[in-house]
């Protein structure tokens, strides 16, 4: 029996978002011992329970108030939302923030030897998918009628097996489509992981813990998107150096022992520092350029 005084977070047990969700919670300082077969894990240092479930169960658990928070792909969340609305329900939840992992796209794909002149080419065709509601919404907007073939896995084999004329499935690299003689022809939905919260009254202690967790998640994401940069630079060219690092805060300037014309610069940059930028910095006279990852960050 779950303790209602503890914050309950649902994450994917295994699959595309599982490892990233676990890593995010760990980097937020939540100590969890996740055994392979254990579906509920208790945090050692916070009043938090982690429920490891199928990804398509997570939206319902949040909408039904069984758990307080869920980490889920926007594609799965939107599909469940459309499904419940189609059944006359009014699902409630809050999206707290989009996360920086789990990026994918839901796309239409057809056999490589078939011509494509837009969604109208699918009129009257049978389309295999695990996302019937997202597919219907998109093709309804295009005025295209179709027959749905619902599959919960191996969608890409449907055309070769004679089950469908085309598919609508998640795509990351496109390699699986190519291996099955298909080509991506239209993106209908772009998705990332997100953190959602149940609707309804929340105990003050739980809400305070959620707010703390959100602050830490923001710090983790900022740290992943930022770099700590150190270099030596000519004193007279500091503004030119700073201009090459858009998104950087004003740097810390430190004197160099025995140097009058050069200083040490330390800064946090929210921009990716490419080799080309480093070469331009060097051309301005910068040296000893170090670009370091940031583990934690709080503004």
From Swiss-Prot:
SUPFAM superfamilies assigned to the protein according to its UniProt record, in alphabetical order: GlnB-like, Periplasmic binding protein-like II
Keyword NAD: no
Activity control: Feedback inhibited by histidine.
GO molecular function, one term: ATP phosphoribosyltransferase activity
InterPro entries listed in its UniProt record: ATP-PRT_HisG_long, ATP_PRibTrfase_cat, ATP_PRibTrfase_CS, ATP_PRibTrfase_HisG, HisG_C, N-reg_PII-like_a/b, N-reg_PII/ATP_PRibTrfase_C
Subcellular location(s) of the protein: Cytoplasm
Gene3D superfamilies: 3.30.70.120, Periplasmic binding protein-like II
Alphabetical UniProt keywords: Amino-acid biosynthesis, ATP-binding, Cytoplasm, Glycosyltransferase, Histidine biosynthesis, Magnesium, Metal-binding, Nucleotide-binding, Transferase
Pfam families, alphabetized: HisG, HisG_C
Pathway connected to this protein: Amino-acid biosynthesis; L-histidine biosynthesis; L-histidine from 5-phospho-alpha-D-ribose 1-diphosphate: step 1/9
The protein's enzyme class: transferase
Catalytic activity: 1-(5-phospho-beta-D-ribosyl)-ATP + diphosphate = 5-phospho-alpha-D-ribose 1-diphosphate + ATP
Homology family: Belongs to the ATP phosphoribosyltransferase family. Long subfamily.
Designated name of the protein: ATP phosphoribosyltransferase
Species name: Salmonella schwarzengrund (strain CVM19633)
Highest classification ranks of the organism: Bacteria, Pseudomonadati, Pseudomonadota, Gammaproteobacteria, Enterobacterales
């Amino acid at each position: 029996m779950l303790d209602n005084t503890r914050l309950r977070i649902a994450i994917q047990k295994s699959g595309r978002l599982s490892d990233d969700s676990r890593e995010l919670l760990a980097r937020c300082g939540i100590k969890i011992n996740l055994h392979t077969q254990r579906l509920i894990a208790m945090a050692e240092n916070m009043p938090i329970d982690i429920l490891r479930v199928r990804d398509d169960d997570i939206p319902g658990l949040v909408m039904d108030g069984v758990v307080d928070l869920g980490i889920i792909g926007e594609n799965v969340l939107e599909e469940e939302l459309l499904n419940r609305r189609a059944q006359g329900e009014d699902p409630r939840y809050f999206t707290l923030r989009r996360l920086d992992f789990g990026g994918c796209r839901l796309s239409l794909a057809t056999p490589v030897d078939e011509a494509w002149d837009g969604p109208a080419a699918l009129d009257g065709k049978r389309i295999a998918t695990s996302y019937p509601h997202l597919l219907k919404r998109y093709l309804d907007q295009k005025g295209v009628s179709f027959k749905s073939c619902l599959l919960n896995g191996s969608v890409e084999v449907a055309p070769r097996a004679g089950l469908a004329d085309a598919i609508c499935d998640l795509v990351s690299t496109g390699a699986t489509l190519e291996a099955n003689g298909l080509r991506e022809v239209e993106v209908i939905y772009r998705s990332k992981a997100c953190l959602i919260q149940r609707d309804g009254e929340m105990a003050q202690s739980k809400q305070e813990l959620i707010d703390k967790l959100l602050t830490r998640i923001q710090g983790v994401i900022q740290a992943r998107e930022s770099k700590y940069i150190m270099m030596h630079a000519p004193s007279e060219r500091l503004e030119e150096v700073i201009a090459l690092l858009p998104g950087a805060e004003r740097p810390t300037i430190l004197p160099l022992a025995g140097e009058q014309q050069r200083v040490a610069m330390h800064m946090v940059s929210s921009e990716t520092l490419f080799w080309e930028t480093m070469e331009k910095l060097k051309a301005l006279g910068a040296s000893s350029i170090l670009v370091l990852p940031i583990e934690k960050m709080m503004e």
